[in-house]
Design a protein with these regions (language model features):
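Gram-negative and organellar
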Residues: 22-495
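Bacterial N-terminal signal peptides that target proteins for export
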Residues: 1-7
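Bacterial N-terminal signal peptides
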Residues: 7-17
C-alpha cells in the first residue's frame, strides 16, 4: 500500500511538472541491484550425556561440533545453515521544483524504494519498502532561509532527521549565522520514526511516541575562521522527560601567520554530565605534499531511553598522523598511523586479571598515473587491538580510454585473527567494474567480484562464505530546459 502511494505521488509530480504547474524541475533517478549469497548459523542442542571430549580437551558433539554446556540437561551449539541468496534492489529519486510563482520558493524531495527480489528474502533494511529520506519546501530570501517538511541536519552532534521546521538568518555585517530547528524526531541513523515496527529489537522498551526535538546553532564565519556552537534537546511527549540533551563546539582557523590550519571540536552530554567526543587536528599543506597530525577522543552516544546507555560505554583516546607526497607528476604516496588506548572501565575480571586496553593501526599506499588512460593504485594496512587484529592489502588498475568509458580491475586480501573467538577469518577477492557515460544525463555501470572467504576453526563448524557478487546500476537525469540554457556569447575586454 505504501509503495502504491509513493508511485502515485511520483506520477502526479511528473504530470504536474509536465503540465506547466512548475516552470522548472529536475529529477535524478538511480537504480541499483546486486546478487549475494551467504550461509548463516542455526542454533542446535544436544543432551548433556551425549557430549564427548574433543582432541583439544573441550566438549563436542559426536560429529565434531564444539558445544557450550551449563548446569542444565542440554548443551548448545551452532551449525552452518543452508546457503541463502538475496537480490536487493534499490531505486532512489531526487526531485527539485522551482519557479512556483513565489520568488525564492522551491520544493525538494529524496526517497527510495527497496526490496529483496531473491528467493530467500534475507536482505536487511527492506522494510518499509518505501522510505522518504527528505522532503521539504524551502523559501530563501536575502539573508533568510526557511524550510518545512522532512529534514536532515548535519552538525557536530551527528546528523539528525526530523519532521518539522528549520530557519536560518545571516547578518552579513558581523558574519554571523543563527539557525533554529524543531519538530518530531526520527530514529538515530535511519529515516524512520523511533516508534516504527521496523525498529523493534527491544519490544516493550521501544518508545510508544516520537520524541520532540529542538535545537539552536550559531556560526561565526569571518574570513578563514569558522566557529560554531550548537545545542540540542529531545523530549518524550508522554511525560516530558529528557531523552537527550547535548551541546557541541567546533572551529577551524589558520594558525596565526603560519601555513598551518587548525580544526577541532568537542561535545558534552548535558543529560548525563559526561564529556563526549573531542578532536584537534593541525594540517600543513604545500603544492607537492601535505602533513597532518592530531589527537581525538571518542565516546559512543546513546539516548536515555535505550538499554545501551545504562552500560556506561568506555571512551578511547588516540593520536594520529597522516601524510601525502607527490613525488612526481605521475607518482603520489600516502601514509597514515594511529595509536589508541581505552580509559579505565572500572570493572573487576577475576578470570583475566590484566585486560588489554590499547592498540595501533597503520596504512600506506600510492597511485601511479602512467598516462592519461592508465592508473595503478595500491594500499597496505595493519591493525593490532584488544582481542583482535587485521592485515589487508588491495590494488586496482584503471583504464579510461576516453571520456565515456572506464574499466577497473581490483583485488585484495584480508586476514582477521580473533583472540577471543573460536575461528580466524581470511578473505580474498578479485573483481572488475565497467562504467559507461552514455551522455550527460545517463550513466550505466556493472561490477562482478569473486570472493573466497574462509572461517577457519578446529571443529566441524568451520564454514566458508565464498561467493560471486554481481552488482549493476543505472542513473538517469531529466528535467526542464530552464537549467540547461546555453552560456551567453563571450565578451572580449577592451585593449
Amino acid at each position: 500500500m505504501t509503495r502504491r502511494c509513493v508511485c502515485i505521488a511520483v506520477g502526479s509530480l511528473a504530470m504536474a511538472s509536465g503540465s506547466g504547474m512548475a516552470q522548472g524541475y529536475r529529477v535524478r533517478v538511480d537504480v541499483r541491484a546486486q546478487a549475494v549469497s551467504f550461509r548463516g548459523l542455526i542454533a542446535d542442542s544436544i543432551p548433556a550425556d551425549q557430549v564427548v571430549t574433543g582432541p583439544s580437551g573441550g566438549f563436542e558433539t559426536p560429529d565434531g561440533y564444539a558445544v557450550r554446556c551449563s548446569s542444565g540437561t542440554h548443551c548448545f551449539f551452532f551449525r552452518p545453515g543452508p546457503e541463502l541468496r538475496g537480490i536487493p534492489l534499490t531505486t532512489s529519486a531526487s526531485v527539485i521544483l522551482w519557479g512556483l510563482g513565489v520568488p525564492g520558493l522551491t520544493v525538494r524531495a529524496t526517497g527510495r524504494l527497496v526490496a529483496d527480489v531473491g528467493p530467500d528474502e534475507v536482505w536487511p533494511g527492506t522494510d518499509p519498502a518505501a522510505q522518504l529520506l527528505e522532503g521539504y519546501v524551502e523559501y530563501q530570501r536575502s539573508a533568510l532561509v526557511a524550510r518545512a517538511g522532512r529534514l536532515m541536519t548535519a552538525s557536530r552532534l551527528e546528523p539528525y532527521g526530523f519532521d518539522g521546521a528549520w530557519l536560518k538568518y545571516r547578518w552579513d555585517d558581523i558574519a554571523l549565522e543563527v539557525t533554529g530547528y524543531g519538530g518530531w524526531g526520527l530514529a538515530q541513523a535511519v529515516a524512520l520514526p523511533v516508534s516504527s515496527a521496523a525498529l523493534n529489537p527491544l519490544d516493550e522498551w521501544r518508545p510508544q511516541d516520537r520524541q520532540i526535538v529542538a535545537g539552536l546553532e550559531t556560526a561565526w564565519l569571518y574570513r578563514a575562521v569558522d566557529l560554531r556552537a550548537e545545542y540540542r534537546r529531545e523530549l518524550d511527549p508522554q511525560d516530558w522527560n529528557i531523552v537527550s540533551e547535548r551541546a557541541g563546539l567546533s572551529f577551524g582557523a589558520p594558525l596565526w601567520r603560519l601555513p598551518v590550519r587548525v580544526a577541532g571540536g568537542l561535545d558534552y552530554n548535558i543529560a548525563e554530565a559526561d564529556l563526549g567526543s573531542a578532536d584537534l587536528r593541525f594540517t600543513y599543506a604545500q603544492p607537492r605534499y601535505a602533513v597532518s597530525a592530531g589527537v581525538r577522543r571518542y565516546r559512543p552516544f546513546f539516548s536515555l531511553w535505550t538499554l545501551w546507555s545504562a552500560f556506561s560505554p568506555v571512551p578511547h583516546n588516540g593520536v594520529n598522523a597522516s601524510a601525502e607526497y607527490r613525488a612526481t607528476r605521475q607518482i603520489s604516496l600516502r601514509a597514515r598511523g594511529e595509536a589508541y588506548w581505552y580509559e579505565d572501565a572500572e570493572v573487576v575480571t577475576g578470570v583475566v586479571p590484566q585486560l588489554e586496553d590499547q592498540g595501533w593501526r597503520a596504512s600506506g599506499g600510492g597511485t601511479v598515473t602512467l598516462n592519461s588512460q592508465w592508473a595503478i593504485d595500491a594500499d597496505l594496512g595493519l591493525e593490532y587491538g584488544p582481542g583482535a587484529s587485521s592485515r589487508y592489502g588491495d590494488a586496482s588498475v584503471t583504464w579510461t580510454p576516453n571520456d565515456r568509458y572506464a574499466f577497473n580491475l581490483y583485488g585484495g586480501t584480508l586476514e582477521r585473527p580473533l583472540e577471543l573467538r573460536f575461528y580466524d577469518a581470511t578473505a580474498l577477492w578479485l573483481g572488475g567494474r565497467a562504467e559507461a557515460l552514455l551522455n550527460r544525463q545517463q550513466r550505466l555501470w556493472a561490477d562482478v567480484a569473486f570472493v573466497d572467504d574462509d572461517r577457519d576453526r578446529p571443529d566441524a563448524a568451520a564454514s566458508s562464505l565464498s561467493q560471486v557478487r554481481l552488482r549493476a546500476g543505472v542513473t538517469l537525469s531529466f528535467g526542464s530546459s530552464a537549467d540547461r540554457m546555453p552560456l551567453p556569447p563571450a565578451v572580449r575586454p577592451p585593449r
